[in-house]
Amino acid sequence: MNPLGSYCYRCENELLKFVRNSEFKVHYQFVTFHNLQTVNQYMKNQKLDETDLDLRNEIYTRIYDAALSYKAALLQGKRPGRQFLFELQHQIHHHNRNYNKELLDEILDNIEIDKKMFYEDKASAAVKTAYDRDLQIAQEMNVTHTPSLVIFDNSNQSYGILLDNSITADTISEICNGEPLPKCPEVKRIVEVRSRHNLAKVVNMNR
């Protein structure tokens, strides 16, 4: 997911809606991902000038910085990390805030995250390496743009299902309940996924 993307934010909420209402035991993990294609997609969605190279570079850097911020927050625990992500997205998409250090400081002052440790971690090589590993995992799973959702079922670990764009609670529920895969290009079966255990179960379902 793109931590600054409005469509990703909506799809995350659809996933959480599924988790709340599901009969399955669901483990999920939000993984940040960006490349030139996702930046182009973001600019198009925001109706920005895609020919403005300076703006493109600025947005690329901003998304990367937000991804590192999320990884740094996660180092202080899964719950604080997700709280940071959701508050960041809420401020951007509901209050039209710009992503900058002022917003980060404001968020950090209101959640249970050590600010000094956060900034030290964010600037560290370890966080950058962790993010690069996320990118590698996403690429191995054939993720090319955001939002994307990869679903694994513990009863059949040889493949996962990649859902691009059309991520709704209803669609996820249909897939998890064993209904025929929707006949649309957004749904793909991934055979012999090598990254499954590395990702620590993006989404696992157990009845």
Question: Residue ranges of each PLM-predicted region?
Answer:
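Short pre-active-site segment immediately N-terminal to redox-active cysteine/selenocysteine motifs
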Residues: M1-Y7
